[in-house]
Amino acid sequence: MQTTQEIQTSQNPLERRIDMSLAVADIDKAVEARLKQMARSVKMPGFRPGKVPLKIVEQTYGPQARSEAIGAAVERAFGEKVREQNLRVAGYPRIEPKEAGSEGALEFSAVFEVYPEVVVGDLSAQSIEQPTLVVGDAEVDKTIDVLRKQRTTFEAAARPTQDGDRVTIDFAGRKDGELFEGGQATDFPFVIGAGSMLKDFETAVVGLGVGETKTFDMTFPEDYHAKHLAGQPVQFEVTLKSVEAPKLPEVDSDFAKALGVADGNVDKLREEVKGNLEREVKRRIQAKVKEQAMDALLAVTPIEVPKALVESEATQLAENAKRDLAARGMNTKDIPVQPAWFGDQAMRRVKLGLIMAEVVKGNELHAKPEQIRGLVEEMAQSYEDPSELVRWYYAQPDRLAQAEAVVIEDNVVAWVLSKAQTSEKSIAFDDLMGNAA
């Protein structure tokens, strides 16, 4: 067996090629050895197990034995060359047989990618903004209001409809004077302003009294999901059957009990809400800072990435998306989730993975046991029995590995912050929580 030095190809700076030459005589010996081994256990009609003549075994299994022998020899030759040259192979090699080889030899080329050299750039000019927010009574009040709205009940109202009411209607829609598919319903309930109906439709219903009928024109949005209606002018006739006004629960003992405060103490409820908010605010601020830190690393560390790793990551992201859809009860066979959809995300994740690995290795940022324990205990604080979650994490190594990965990311973020320019900026509660109007 002979191999030549790996060669960089011109198309891809990370692609390499190793040429290999395998002696036919060596392959023949390997084939014969495989056939003899197979003959010991192969079963054929008319022969006892292990008594089939080698010639007959060769006639039946010869091509399979030769293919396996060549595959094993190529794999062995490739592995030896990779170790000899200290190459870090990314993905699997593509084996290409050569049409014209030397006499008495089989010649192949192994084409593969290697991991890039990662040199993290200077972060001193990178700016990272750290949001700040102190959770106070106003934030607690807003959150309790959200919790109240989630428990809204409705009572019959003897007045015209207004925003927030739950109404029941009959309606019929016409396009060019003809009823269109999906445009009719009876005893149809919806909450005005909840967004379940088109805004123009909801607006037209406001001000109606029970028993009143209204006819109005509207135009479907250009991006409406029903293509035959997108951008089309239509006319609706609506009859109001009932109107119910929203009623929010009082913040009292019953409300507190409904939210898990056993003794119904409202002050205790506010304390729990504040504690949960502080944890959520911390988590969201950390996420914003982490994203900036990752962007900074990418900005100062331009690298080529192996296509094989990006393709593998995109495939994994697509599979994750399918599992998520299936968990929501959707039939993924009807939804053609393609790895290509995740190309940019996969590229970013692979780049960051390579860069972070270099940062961790070069700066000894591996997770310490006490850091992992601290993170797990912090996450457990939002549970009724924190010790149960801690035990759950420590019961399986793979669960603890997830916590370890988070700690390592936090260590990298802290390292970036120590190198970059940082500043603090107050952020509004609604902006941080995504509730801004």
Curated annotation (Swiss-Prot):
GO cellular component, one term: cytoplasm
Pfam families: FKBP_C, Trigger_C, Trigger_N
Coiled-coil intervals: none
InterPro entries: PPIase_dom_sf, PPIase_FKBP_dom, Trig_fac, Trigger_fac_C, Trigger_fac_C_sf, Trigger_fac_ribosome-bd_bac, Trigger_fac_ribosome-bd_sf, Trigger_fact/SurA_dom_sf
GO molecular function: peptidyl-prolyl cis-trans isomerase activity; protein folding chaperone; ribosome binding
Protein keywords: Cell cycle, Cell division, Chaperone, Cytoplasm, Isomerase, Rotamase
Listed EC numbers: 5.2.1.8
Leader sequence segment: none
PROSITE patterns assigned: FKBP_PPIASE
Catalytic activity reported: [protein]-peptidylproline (omega=180) = [protein]-peptidylproline (omega=0)
Cellular localization per UniProt: Cytoplasm
Boundaries of every PPIase FKBP-type domain copy: 164-249
Residue stretches spanning the membrane: none
Primary location group: cytoplasm
Keyword Chaperone: yes
A single GO BP: cell division
Domain remark from Swiss-Prot or TrEMBL: Consists of 3 domains; the N-terminus binds the ribosome, the middle domain has PPIase activity, while the C-terminus has intrinsic chaperone activity on its own.
Similarity comment: family membership: Belongs to the FKBP-type PPIase family. Tig subfamily.
Function (record text): Involved in protein export. Acts as a chaperone by maintaining the newly synthesized protein in an open conformation. Functions as a peptidyl-prolyl cis-trans isomerase.
Annotated protein name in UniProt: Trigger factor
Organism encoding this protein: Azoarcus sp. (strain BH72)
Taxonomic lineage: Bacteria, Pseudomonadati, Pseudomonadota, Betaproteobacteria, Rhodocyclales
